[in-house]
Design a protein with these regions (language model features):
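Short amphipathic alpha-helical coupling segments at ligand-binding clamshell hinges
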Residues: 204-208, 301-314, 376, 397-400
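Extracytoplasmic "Venus flytrap"/periplasmic binding protein-like
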Residues: 1-58, 93-95, 99, 239-240, ...
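Glycine-centered hinge/linker elements that transmit conformational signals in sensory
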Residues: 116-122, 160-223, 269, 273
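Short helix-initiation/N-cap motifs at beta->coil->alpha
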Residues: 1-4, 112-116, 220-235
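Beta->alpha turn/N-cap motifs
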Residues: 21-25, 226, 243-249, 272-274, ...
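Long, aromatic- and glycine/proline-rich binding clefts that accommodate carbohydrate-like moieties
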Residues: 265-275, 325-388, 418-448, 455-457, ...
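Extracytoplasmic/periplasmic substrate-recognition and gating elements
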Residues: 66-71, 214-219, 228, 238, ...
Length: 462
């Protein structure tokens, strides 16, 4: 699908009247000048086919589909976040509570930081080992060198560790990919150019990923991709997962699963993710995917109007609540706060509570700093995949990735873009950037502070 919209934008060949496309491409959509600015379309050419009841203020993801110019380029159709997932029934067991406290000195509960997540992973894999006659693991992930490995990292893993700067929906001047912007102009990904793609927090995040995958996850996880790994926690032998997409909620709440009670309620719960050692208040804390209606210039006018009408129908208040209850990918505040969602909440494992909490606002998609998502996405899985397989050291892989990102920025600078064309910074000594008080930051002396946990209710209070 990305190739289709990319082809239509780059060549002008009309393939489809509309797309549902990830808002991760917002920076590219804005800069190409080929995607319809919906703000102007709704009061101009599309005014007669724009619903008076559309109520854009009711959409929770509008800031994610808005360009640096304040104009709307995509209309959200579905959203899901990546959160922390854990077996609440196991965490609540008095025998496991006591054993954990005896070993680690604090309560087995929702982890506040990565140190606690690591302790809990070790606890279940190394110390508990078996529950009810079955081998159990304290961590689940996937490590196959495959395109889906890319979004495992580009979907805010660096910012969860603490890379980048403060700011919502994305850090400024350095975002969760480690790309620095000045104004709206991307100027570098490598630390030598003021970026953070190969900085200390990025290296820490990849090293932790590899360490946990090798030590605490099922052995087969290393050869799994996103699709293969997604269903594994439902089999009942995983204690927690730090990076779990809420899009799996519907599949994980089916009756007769090992992780579902007889009354249909889940044995598990989702909660806001723990934060890495480099994280500081004000930095985003996770990723939220937004699939959004996108119109491309050059589409025949009548086709575009028909497509816009249909797009609005699919997200209208008449439809969206039912769609949310079935797909569990909410887009409207009114749906989230509805009586129907309150009634559904006990069987959804914390989904409703998360989306009603202030914590939700710290989970955001890839932002406008990324000028060409289709070209830049592959560098993630190819380089980090090589590090996971031990083919190159982590720092070397990240250095190469940052250099490749800089090369893409340089190429875009040479070609030019419709708006906010990249302009690569000169390489400077690291001390120059460290003294600015923004990302990149120096390596911490201690990357494993004491583990800290909290009650579920407190985790929602960001």
């Amino acid at each position: 699908m990305v190739k289709k919209i990319e082809t239509q934008v780059r060549t002008g060949i009309h393939l489809y009247d509309a797309y549902i496309n990830d808002s991760d491409l917002i920076g590219w959509h804005y800069r190409t000048g080929k995607v319809v600015n919906l703000t102007d379309y709704m009061v101009g050419e599309g005014k007669a086919v724009t619903l008076p009841t559309l109520d854009l203020k009711d959409f929770i993801g509008i800031s994610f589909t808005t360009g640096p110019d304040g104009k709307l380029y995509q209309l959200p159709d579905q959203q899901f976040a990546n959160l922390y997932w854990y077996r609440k029934d196991w965490f609540d067991r008095p025998d496991l509570q006591k054993k954990f406290k005896d070993i680690y000195g604090y309560k087995l509960n929702v982890p506040v930081n990565w140190s606690a997540y690591e302790d809990i992973a070790q606890f279940f894999t190394v110390h508990v080992k078996e529950l009810d006659g079955h081998k159990v693991y304290g961590h689940m992930d996937y490590g196959k060198k495959d395109p889906s490995l890319g979004w495992r990292f580009s979907d805010a893993w660096f910012s969860m560790a603490g890379a980048g700067d403060t700011g919502l929906p994305n850090g400024k001047p350095v975002d969760d990919w480690g790309i620095r912007v000045e104004g709206c102009t991307p100027v570098g990904a490598s630390v030598e150019r003021g970026g953070d793609m190969n900085g200390a927090a990025a290296a820490y995040s990849v090293n932790k990923f590899i360490d946990w995958l090798n030590k605490y996850a099922p052995p087969e996880a290393k050869e799994m991709d996103f699709g293969m790994a997604g269903s594994l926690p439902a089999q009942g032998h995983i204690a927690q997962q730090i990076f779990w997409y809420t899009a799996f909620t519907a599949a994980m709440t089916k009756p007769h699963l090992a992780v579902t009670n007889a009354d249909g309620t889940p044995k598990w719960r989702m909660a806001p993710s723990p934060k890495g050692a480099y994280w500081k208040s004000g930095v985003k804390l996770g990723y939220q995917d937004v699939g959004a209606w996108t119109l491309v210039k050059g589409t025949p006018a009548d086709n575009m109007k028909a497509a816009w009408l249909y797009a609005q129908f699919t997200v209208s208040k008449t439809v969206s609540l039912k769609k949310t209850l079935v797909g569990l990918t909410p887009i409207r505040e009114s749906d989230i706060n509805s009586k129907a969602m309150t009634q559904a909440a006990p069987k959804l494992g914390g989904l409703v509570e998360f989306y009603r909490s202030p914590a939700r606002k710290r989970w955001t998609p890839t932002g406008t700093n990324i000028p060409d998502y289709p070209s830049m996405a592959p560098i993630w899985w190819k380089n980090i995949g090589a590090a996971i397989r031990g083919e190159v050291p982590v720092q070397s892989a990240l250095n190469t990735m940052a250099q490749q990102a800089d090369a893409i920025l340089a190429n875009l600078e040479q070609k030019g873009m419709s708006k906010c064309t990249p302009k690569l910074n000169a390489k400077m000594p690291l001390s120059f950037w460290y003294n600015k008080g923004t990302a990149p930051f120096t390596k911490l002396a201690n990357e494993k502070p004491k583990g800290e946990t909290q009650d579920y209710e407190n985790s929602l209070k960001y």
